[in-house]
Each structure stands twice: as C-alpha cells, then as structure tokens.
Amino acid sequence: MAAPSEAPERRRPFGRRFLTDPTRLFQHNAWDNVEWSEEQEATAKSKVQENSSQLLPQDKQEEYEVNAKRYWDDFYKIHENGFFKDRHWLFTEFPELAPNRNPSQNEDSLCEFSCKEVSKNEGLGSCENGHCTLENRAENQLNLLKSSPRFCTEELAPQKLKQSYEDYPGSSASYRILEVGCGAGNTVFPILQTNNDPGLFVYCCDFSTTAVDLVQSNVEYDSSRCFAFVHDLCNDQSPFPMPDESLDIVILIFVLSAILPEKMQCVINKLSRLLKPGGMILLRDYGRYDLAQLRFKKGQCLSANFYVRGDGTRVYFFTQDELDDLFTRAGLQKIQNLVDRRLQVNRGKQMTMYRVWIQCKYQKPAGPQL
C-alpha cells in the first residue's frame, strides 16, 4: 500500500475564535491560533536562557529519576481524580478515538481546555524503579523481553519480538486503543462513554500505582471493555498485556514530556511495535516557550528544556522537529505535526497567558515499503 498522504500543515482550528480586533481581547476566555511577534519570541527565548543558566547538580538529577514513581504516586494521593477535567475535546482533535461519532458534537469543546488541565503534565513521570502488576497471562512476555537489547540505539531495531498470545485482555476485540499515562481516567472514561462500538477495547496504563487504583475503583470501570495496569515504559522487563501489532491507536496526552529525554526514543520504538500496520500514535504535549516553561525559576532546570516542578515531577518542552525525529526514527510516517498557540485570558485579573502545545499523528506503514 502506498504511504499515507500528509495532511496539510495548517490545521483546522480548535474553535473558530480568532482575535482580529485587539479591543475585544477580554470578551472571551481564549483565542485560537495566535501568532507571536518577533519581539514576543525573543522575550521568551531570553526567559528560557535565564531560567536554564543554572542546572541542578547531577546527584539531584539522579535522585529525581530514581524516585520518579514516588513523586507521581504522591501527586495522585493528594489530588485523586479532582485535578484534571475529563477530555471530551479529544474527539474533535482525534476523531480516530470514536470513528462513528457525529463530528458536530462538542465542536468547540476545546474552549473548555483550561489552564488547570495543562498546569501539570499528565501521566507516567520518568521510568526508573517502576513495577508492573499485570495478570499472570502477561508474564510469558517477560522471557521475550529479557532477551531483547537492554538499551535502544538511535534507530529502531529491525527485528521484531516474536510473541505467541492465545488469550489476553481484549483478544476478541476488533478495535483496540491504549492510553499511556492514563492518570485517574480523564481520557479513558470519555472514550468508553462516547465510542459505543461493540468491538472496542481500551487499555490504559500509568507509572503510578495510585493512578491505576483510581481508574479501577471508578464506578464506570468496566473490565469487559477496559483493562487498566501499572506499566514502566522504560523498563524492558515491564510487560504489556497485549502482543505486538495488536493496537489500532496509542494515545500520549502530556505524557512523553515527563520522561527523561535520553529515554524517549526507546519509548517510542517500544510503542510503535505494538501498533498494527496502519495503526497510529496520537500525541498532544507541551511546546517550546509555553507559559509553563517561562514561569520556571533558576535552579529548576535539569537539562536543556527539561525542568523539575516543586513536587518533584518533571516536564520537557518540545519542538515539532524533535517529535518528528522521534517518530520517524521509530519507522512511523507523519500524518499531522502542528503547533497550537493559544491565548488564554483571565478576565477578572485582566491577565493574558500564551500557551504552546504540539499535536501529532504518526502512522505505522500499512505494508512493506518498496
């Protein structure tokens, strides 16, 4: 099959609200596709240079890596399921999550995408000292993973893992979705509510045991349609409950940014192996010079564009080219890679907040490339 055609780089707007008259700035809470001036970008670069001029000592950086799981567990113990809003806007941006849904539903739902939603990056944190709590049926993957390379190279290893799964959660499903870094279920449950395909099965995993417990204890958790499990993406001995080439969609929403940059390529390689030919990875994450990056102070920078928050969780701020390189090195083809520059407004305080997010869709080739 021929390679998929690239979607135009100029995106369909999240909403249809554009600031054409500056005098109307405080009439709404958010404005879409806001272009930055050269002066504004220069100011942002200057702030990043300033807050990254003093890096944390290496021993402190190693401490945040080793204890990453504990920091995310603590986060979910404190906030439980009350920190993030359910992401009903996802179906506007990623219709692949509910292919049969009426596209007119929630057309402007991203206006609900509040600062609170992205004030903390979602998901799994770093990947050291994590553990897996899968059912015994997934244990047969351990021996296969132990024999695979411990460290990944720049390019995706050409060989595939040979797997034999007779029965696994969702084995009879016709459409399988995996969300990585599921948190308390703010993506999973909207998918289960919106996508009524009887052949749908949704997997969701998180680095935090506490987060997975929150998903499994939710009254909407239905084990006949969903399987939640603890998973450490960066640990080669942490198994998945499904075989390679079994997934239609992998979702990464504010998750990749929480991983140590040196480990990101290995993570994307690992996830790409799970995709069926024609399957896609859907990503939304922090972009370079987002307000959250500019607000960091000296002494919070770990490495270039990688920071630690006050609670010990970490976050990276991407460029489009960096993400494109990660995905294409994993053998995936670009369908979408765009920047969403959003101007959010606090009308009460007369404040403006410039947000920068990147949204991507990358697809596994549907057949051998000739």
Swiss-Prot record:
Organism per entry: Gallus gallus
Function of the protein: S-adenosyl-L-methionine-dependent methyltransferase that mediates N(3)-methylcytidine modification of residue 32 of the tRNA anticodon loop of tRNA(Thr)(UGU) and tRNA(Arg)(CCU). N(3)-methylcytidine methylation by METTL2 requires the N6-threonylcarbamoylation of tRNA (t6A37) by the EKC/KEOPS complex as prerequisite.
GO biological process: one example: tRNA methylation
Listed PANTHER family: METHYLTRANSFERASE-RELATED (PTHR22809), TRNA N(3)-METHYLCYTIDINE METHYLTRANSFERASE METTL2A-RELATED (PTHR22809:SF4)
Presence of keyword Transferase: yes
Top class in the EC scheme: transferase
Entry binding sites for S-adenosyl-L-methionine: 72, 76, 181, 206, 232-233, 253
Assigned EC number: 2.1.1.-
SUPFAM superfamilies in alphabetical order: S-adenosyl-L-methionine-dependent methyltransferases
InterPro entries registered for this protein in UniProt: Methyltransf_12, METTL2/6/8-like, SAM-dependent_MTases_sf
Localization, UniProt: Cytoplasm
Protein name, as recorded: tRNA N(3)-cytidine methyltransferase METTL2
Family: Belongs to the methyltransferase superfamily. METL family.
Binding partners and assembly: Monomer.
Pfam families: Methyltransf_12 (PF08242)
